[in-house]
Amino acid sequence: MARAGWTGLLPLYVCLLLTCGFAKAGKLLVVPMDGSHWFTMQSVVEKLILRGHEVVVVMPEVSWQLGRSLNCTVKTYSTSYTLEDQDREFMVFADARWTAPLRSAFSLLTSSSNGIFDLFFSNCRSLFNDRKLVEYLKESCFDAVFLDPFDACGLIVAKYFSLPSVVFARGIFCHYLEEGAQCPAPLSYVPRLLLGFSDAMTFKERVWNHIMHLEEHLFCPYFFKNVLEIASEILQTPVTAYDLYSHTSIWLLRTDFVLEYPKPVMPNMIFIGGINCHQGKPVPMEFEAYINASGEHGIVVFSLGSMVSEIPEKKAMAIADALGKIPQTVLWRYTGTRPSNLANNTILVKWLPQNDLLGHPMTRAFITHAGSHGVYESICNGVPMVMMPLFGDQMDNAKRMETKGAGVTLNVLEMTSEDLENALKAVINDKSYKENIMRLSSLHKDRPVEPLDLAVFWVEFVMRHKGAPHLRPAAHDLTWYQYHSLDVIGFLLAVVLTVAFITFKCCAYGYRKCLGKKGRVKKAHKSKTH
């Protein structure tokens, strides 16, 4: 009888458990960025969907990677450009990096290849021009916004709908991360983005670091002028970059202190470096055949990322010449024109399973542009690197890995075939590179929580608590002179000067009185003698 009673109640218990699970589920708005930025953000979104959250992704109808195979609601809006326009402008930008590097805010502002940024920055105007979509978002009652800050549209959306936001990024160009999080960044040992400096800067480098910081404050507002105009138009009030970035609840930063130099951080800055790493799978048979044919020498993996498909012919031939002089088999991800001097040991492929190949025991080195995804896959799998940075954070990533003895950096504009050959032979034959990258790999993997789980936790945290105001520093409420304690310094200086002035006056008065009295005594004594 009792057993029958329990059996009868079983469906009720199941329903209660399911109800509890759904009660904890929230509603999340996702505003992503196209290209490689989406690769790891997608993994967080997919896990949130698996955990029962209702996810809505808002994206432009023109994109390279966005929204593919997502089991959630995807809302698109029309854009003022076509996919051909986007491809063309990106090719202009990428091709220009083979002739003119971006090493400062001024060079970025004055570059003639910035059309791709104008396209991306226009997305938010297109989104808010879709009144039907805006109305849908307004009525959806989201718990939070999960966003990539590259084009600032997610930040504008969060501010427009008054929603707490979780930013997902490697870093923020200009000074907007430090300003938005109110995080100190001493210029004496925290290098600015794009410079490719280490934390142990020479006097000259510290001078350049200060100049770069000044450049950012002078020129970044002009670079983001279109974004700020669009934001002001949408929010119907003058908007600064600080207004957009300073309301972020949590910063999910795709780095950690295995890659980064030690520096001050704030409590709402969460480090999830290596979130793109995963357990390597067996490589496809085609690639396994290449590996087996390489013999004892093994293979070298060569990829400049998903966004760089072609290399200038002269440079491609110099690279091909260097690759032909090493005994390893080289798997080169390349879709450009086949170099005429390509050696037999070099195999061109349009796609390769990068992480799986790096995890193969026969992989000896990785030639990379030093994007954060590739660098972390190299760290996770313990493969030394030859780095050829092109733009963005790549110069900084390369410098960090070179400083830690995990690879060699080459200037892609100036390097010769011999430079690449020597760099490859160094990282393959010098055991210190392998030992250093394995040490970094061990440090990176020694953590209490996996980066993906940590990212999911903090997104859910913001959804549950409608933000994280307890992590917001009071520095946001101070004026610039209060933040730097200039009013306190001024007051204390005034007190010291006042006390010094009064003391001086008292001493002067006492001295005059004393001197006057002594003078009168002398005068009286002199008159008596006469």
UniProtKB/Swiss-Prot annotation:
Pfam families: UDPGT
Protein family membership: Belongs to the UDP-glycosyltransferase family.
Protein name listed in UniProt: UDP-glucuronosyltransferase 1A7
More info: UGT1A7 isoform is part of the UGT1A complex locus which displays alternative use of promoters, first exons and terminal exons. The locus is defined by 13 first exons, which are alternatively spliced to 3 other common exons and 2 alternative terminal exons 5. From the 27 possible mRNA isoforms, 9 produce functionally active polypeptides (UGT1A1, 1A3, 1A4, 1A5, 1A6, 1A7, 1A8, 1A9 and 1A10) called isoforms 1 (i1). Use of an alternative exon 5 (5b) as terminal exon is leading to 9 additional alternatively spliced products termed isoforms i2 and which lack transferase activity.
High-level lineage: Eukaryota, Metazoa, Chordata, Craniata, Vertebrata
Tissue: Liver and gastric tissue. Isoform 1 and isoform 2 are expressed in esophagus. Neither isoform is expressed in liver, kidney, colon and small intestine.
EC number(s) stated in the UniProt entry for this protein: 2.4.1.17
Glycosylation sites: N71, N292, N344
Family annotation (Gene3D superfamilies): Glycogen Phosphorylase B
GO biological process: coumarin metabolic process; estrogen metabolic process; fatty acid metabolic process; flavone metabolic process; flavonoid metabolic process; liver development; negative regulation of fatty acid metabolic process; retinoic acid metabolic process
S-S bonds: none
Localization terms from the record: Endoplasmic reticulum membrane
Membrane-crossing segments per the record: 488-504
Gene Ontology MF, one: protein homodimerization activity
Keyword Lipid metabolism attached: yes
Record's catalysed reaction(s): glucuronate acceptor + UDP-alpha-D-glucuronate = acceptor beta-D-glucuronoside + UDP + H(+); 17alpha-estradiol + UDP-alpha-D-glucuronate = 17alpha-estradiol 3-O-(beta-D-glucuronate) + UDP + H(+); prunetin + UDP-alpha-D-glucuronate = prunetin-5-O-beta-D-glucuronide + UDP; 5-epi-5-F2t-IsoP + UDP-alpha-D-glucuronate = 5-epi-5-F2t-IsoP-glucuronide + UDP + H(+)
Signal peptide positions on this chain: 1-25
Organism: Homo sapiens (Human)
Annotated GO CC locations: endoplasmic reticulum; endoplasmic reticulum membrane
Subunit-structure text: Homodimer. Homooligomer. Interacts with UGT1A1, UGT1A3, UGT1A4, UGT1A6, UGT1A8, UGT1A9 and UGT1A10 to form heterodimers. Isoform 1 interacts with isoform 2/i2 suggesting that oligomerization is involved in negative regulation of transferase activity by isoform 2. Isoform 1 also interacts with respective i2 isoforms of UGT1A1, UGT1A3, UGT1A4, UGT1A6, UGT1A8, UGT1A9 and UGT1A10.
Keyword line: Endoplasmic reticulum, Glycoprotein, Glycosyltransferase, Lipid metabolism, Membrane, Signal, Transferase, Transmembrane, Transmembrane helix
Mode of membrane association: Single-pass membrane protein
Matches recorded under InterPro entries: UDP-glycosyltransferase (IPR050271), UDP_glucos_trans (IPR002213), UDP_glycos_trans_CS (IPR035595)
